[in-house]
Amino acid sequence: MMMIAPSKMSAQEDNGFKKFSVEEAFEDNGFQWFRDAQLLCAGNKEKSNAMTIGWGGIGTLWQRPALTVYVAEQRFTQKFMDDSEYFTVMSFDVKDSKVLNYMGTKSGRDGDKAQALGLHTAYTANGTPYYTEATMVIECKIMYAAPFDPQYFKSDVPKNMYGNFTAGVHSMYIGEVVNAWKK
């Protein structure tokens, strides 16, 4: 009798996630999704950082599924984004709003925010960090990164925004969606 060994489950499946295609099964409103706040994480197994984000976009660019995020120059996470090849964006259940609130008001410069919240860090096959408490994880490979250049602002909206914003001009990171999982 021939025995077939069970296939090795991915770390994400071990943590209750199922892989899905953002192009076929992303059910959230792309305009509202970032307004509801998501968690951005970058780094590696030695050191990572996450922050709450409310700006972003999801769609298609260069014939690839793409996700765009923005990080201000004085944010601790920006160095992790600049030094990383991949990043994750995570959704959390509404009842976990303390996670998004804390990650959005505390700096990783002052301590390990994930540890302070009791979050469990796991890693994708690419080594990208995510938290097992998330309800959805989208992993992206950075295709483009650049800071906004104020000389190209064409309306008063960004001019007025940055006139009172102490964290500096944002950098834009466009990532190709390479993996997505949800619970």
Label the predicted regions.
Residues M1-Q12:
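Bacterial Sec-dependent N-terminal signal peptides
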Residues S10-K183:
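Basic, polyanion-binding surface patches
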